[in-house]
A protein has these predicted regions:
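Bacterial Sec-dependent N-terminal signal peptides
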Residues: 1-36, 244, 271, 306, ...
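Subset of outer-membrane beta-barrel
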Residues: 34-324
């Protein structure tokens, strides 16, 4: 799971350095941040970066994830996420809607985002194109009271708790056809500025995403290979992830193992299975830039999918329960 505030998370290796970073950041009048979280399970959490994916399947889709970066370091980044989306019929057309909540703790910063998503799902070239919009409320907090350095009475340093809010907009396109999908999206389109107290501002930079994936069927009908990729940039920091998973499916169980590679950043191992109808996934990200393998990132994912029978009269009948 990747995340950054002006300087990449990968650079925050020691508590002392983290504290110094926060003082430097808060000692200027404007902070520019690209702090979006990208999860290792991005292939199951597409609405987290592309609202066009809302309602793409005729199912109620509920996801939750918890990620802990740089295990073993004090004040290490930790993120909690939960979302739900589903399709619905209105005026003889298919739409998608969703809700999303994210809480991201990075040192003395706390980022909270509550979002509503909408997508218009249209048939195109034998597949489905989702055109999505997202409206978010950003709530930012910095707790300067926890600074452990003696900064005296210098007014340039924020040594109290400061809060701020802002409205944010995102948009995305998501196209899927049989075993293939591709998506483009942009978050923080208006580059919202959050006032933190009277002296400081948090500038949230726009970020851009591209994703694609394809499922390969093997001779053994119980096996298939799912490949996916995600790239994003804010104009300063760029990251790409390439993932492959081997899926085993039988009448009574489903499980997978896989690996993800991010050039110059990390290698991630992925494991997942269905447990009593709930899909559970685990990922461990090992950094390749000098951080000890034991100080990698842990991520836990839980997913639930329920089939919906959406008829033209607008009645949604729950026929059966199926899972990833």
């Amino acid at each position: 799971m990747a995340n950054s505030i002006h300087i990449s998370r990968r650079a925050l290796r020691k508590n002392v350095f983290l504290t110094l970073l926060m003082i430097v950041v808060l000692s200027v009048s404007e902070v520019r941040a690209q702090y979006d979280v990208v999860f290792s399970h991005y292939f199951d959490m597409e609405t987290s970066f592309n609202p066009g994916a809302a309602g793409k399947d005729p199912k109620l889709n509920i996801n939750a994830a918890y990620a802990m970066d740089m295990a073993g370091f004090e004040h290490n980044p930790q993120t909690a996420y939960i979302s739900a989306d589903m399709p619905f019929r209105f005026l003889n057309a298919t739409h998608g809607c969703g809700l999303e909540f994210t809480n991201d703790k990075l040192g003395l910063f706390n980022h909270t985002r509550l979002s509503i998503l909408y997508a218009n799902q249209q048939r195109l070239f034998g597949g489905t194109l989702g055109i999505g919009l997202q409206l978010s409320l950003l709530a930012e907090k910095f707790d300067g009271s926890e600074l452990d350095l003696d900064v005296g009475s210098d007014p340039a340093f924020t040594t109290s708790q400061v809060n701020g809010q802002a409205i944010d907009f995102s948009a995305g396109l998501y196209y899927s056809r049989k075993a293939f999908y591709v998506g483009l999206s942009a978050k923080h389109l208006t580059s919202p500025k959050v006032e933190l107290g009277e002296l400081n501002e948090l500038q949230v930079s726009a970020s851009y995403y591209a994703t694609a994936g394809y499922t390969f069927k093997l001779r053994n009908p119980m096996l298939q290979v799912k490949t996916s990729a995600l790239a994003y940039t804010d104009g300063v920091m760029t990251r790409a992830d390439i993932t492959g998973r081997l899926i085993y499916t039988s009448e009574k169980r489903k499980m997978y193992g896989g690996i993800s590679y991010s050039p110059t950043n990390s290698v991630t191992a992925l494991l997942g299975m269905d447990i009593r109808g709930i899909h559970v996934g685990y990922a461990y990200e090992c950094y390749t830039n000098g951080i000890s393998p034991g100080n990698g990132s842990h991520e836990l994912f839980v997913g639930y999918k329920m089939d919906l029978n959406i008829v033209k009269k607008g009645k949604n009948l729950h026929k059966s329960v199926r899972f990833l």
